[in-house]
């Protein structure tokens, strides 16, 4: 029974899984991104541009893929992501997610009030 449940859970998760990227290749590809998000991905050039360092790789893959497909709208990011291959997106996510981040985490208790 446990084995069947595990197989079922893995089958459900597989559409959301991604192969992972090459952080070294992502570092090379990130130079264009750093122009707006900052060289360390913690110091964007404007307050309305997000800090990305340390962000979860699955979030970064989803966001870039959505910009590329047009599901998420932003004229700058749509153009930038449109030029990326699926492997480029994986590589960038692997690199950026591995950087030390300054993301603000909201405690769950504050969200549930």
Where are the regions a protein language model picked out?
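Positively charged n-region of N-terminal signal peptides that target proteins for export
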Residues: 1-4
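Cleavable N-terminal signal peptides
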Residues: 6-7, 17
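N-terminal signal peptide c-region/cleavage motif recognized by signal peptidases
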Residues: 13-14
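Flexible coil segments in periplasmic/lumen-exposed cytochrome c-class electron-transfer proteins
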Residues: 20-31, 39, 72-113
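Gly/Gly-Pro-rich "capping" loops immediately C-terminal to redox-active cysteine motifs
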Residues: 23, 41-69, 78-83
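Short, cysteine/histidine-rich loop/knuckle motifs that typically chelate Zn2+
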Residues: 35
């Amino acid at each position: 029974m446990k084995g069947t449940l595990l197989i079922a859970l893995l089958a459900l998760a597989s559409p959301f899984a991604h192969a992972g990227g090459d952080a070294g290749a992502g570092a090379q590809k990130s130079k264009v991104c750093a122009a707006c998000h900052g060289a360390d991905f913690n110091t964007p050039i404007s307050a309305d541009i997000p800090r990305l360092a340390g962000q979860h790789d699955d979030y970064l893959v989803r966001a870039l893929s959505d910009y590329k497909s047009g599901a998420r709208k932003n004229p700058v990011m749509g153009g930038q992501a449109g030029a990326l291959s699926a492997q480029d997106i994986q590589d960038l996510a692997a690199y950026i997610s591995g950087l030390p981040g300054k993301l603000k985490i909201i405690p769950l208790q504050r969200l549930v009030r």
